[in-house]
């Protein structure tokens, strides 16, 4: 019977890379970030609700959500984050549920790629939780390089989530991403072999 696995981790922990690798191994990935973008795409009901609640500044000159403005707003005002989540989350859940059911019907194991799985208390909606683990210092380095953030801003983003150590303790399986991409792939393959998703290579001498 196909399984539904919740994949999560800290910000900049390498979760997207793991998702890509899992899709290569035959899993179907349902991406919460992608669903969230779809929920407020240009012309959508979700975006109309965002404009109604947050005003015209929430929409950019192309008629799309002003992500920089909204990102700063919800990061600095937790009550605004709750208002935005109240609009987006129900739409995102519907999009993800529909996609998940379609894949299950076809017999695929499904990865629910959800950055804030524990923060939104969604662990009971999946069969297992896998956490991509890295150190906080690596998270901050990646954020500073990838998002061009100062150390203080990177720290603020890392500490706005449940710590990666706590998430790891709550997980069914932890995927170590303290090394490079090759090591990450090897760690993931080891887990998939142990759990029976892929066969262990046969290093025997043959017939």
Curated annotation (Swiss-Prot):
Its main location: cytoplasm. It is found in: Cytoplasm. Pfam families: CoaE. Pathway: Cofactor biosynthesis; coenzyme A biosynthesis; CoA from (R)-pantothenate: step 5/5. InterPro entries: Depp_CoAkinase, P-loop_NTPase. The keyword ATP-binding applies. GO terms for biological process: coenzyme A biosynthetic process. Its EC number is 2.7.1.24. Residues 4-203 form the DPCK domain. Keywords: ATP-binding, Coenzyme A biosynthesis, Cytoplasm, Kinase, Nucleotide-binding, Transferase. ATP binds at residues 12-17. It catalyses: 3'-dephospho-CoA + ATP = ADP + CoA + H(+). One of its GO terms (molecular function) is ATP binding. One of its GO terms (cellular component) is cytoplasm. Belongs to the CoaE family. PANTHER family: BIFUNCTIONAL COENZYME A SYNTHASE-RELATED, DEPHOSPHO-COA KINASE-RELATED. Catalyzes the phosphorylation of the 3'-hydroxyl group of dephosphocoenzyme A to form coenzyme A. HAMAP family: Dephospho_CoA_kinase. This is Dephospho-CoA kinase. It comes from Staphylococcus aureus (strain MRSA252). The gene is coaE.
């Amino acid at each position: 019977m196909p399984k539904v696995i919740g994949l999560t981790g800290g910000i900049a922990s390498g979760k997207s890379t793991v998702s890509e690798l899992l899709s290569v191994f035959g899993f179907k990935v349902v991406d919460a970030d992608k669903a969230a973008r779809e929920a407020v795409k240009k012309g959508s009901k979700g975006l109309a609700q965002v404009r109604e609640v947050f005003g015209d500044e929430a929409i950019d000159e192309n008629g799309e959500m002003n992500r920089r403005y909204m990102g700063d707003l919800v990061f600095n005002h937790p009550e605004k984050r709750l208002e935005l989540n109240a609009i987006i989350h129900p739409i995102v859940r519907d999009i993800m549920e529909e996609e998940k059911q379609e894949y299950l019907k076809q017999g695929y194991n499904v990865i629910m790629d959800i950055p804030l799985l524990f923060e939104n208390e969604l662990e009971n909606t999946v069969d297992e939780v896998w956490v991509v683990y890295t150190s906080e210092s690596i998270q901050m380095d990646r954020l500073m390089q990838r998002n061009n953030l100062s150390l203080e801003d990177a720290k603020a983003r890392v500490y706005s989530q449940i710590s990666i150590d706590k998430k790891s303790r709550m997980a069914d399986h932890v995927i170590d991403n303290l090394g490079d991409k090759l090591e990450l792939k090897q760690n993931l393959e080891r887990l998939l072999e142990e759990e029976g998703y892929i066969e262990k290579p046969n290093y025997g001498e043959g017939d």
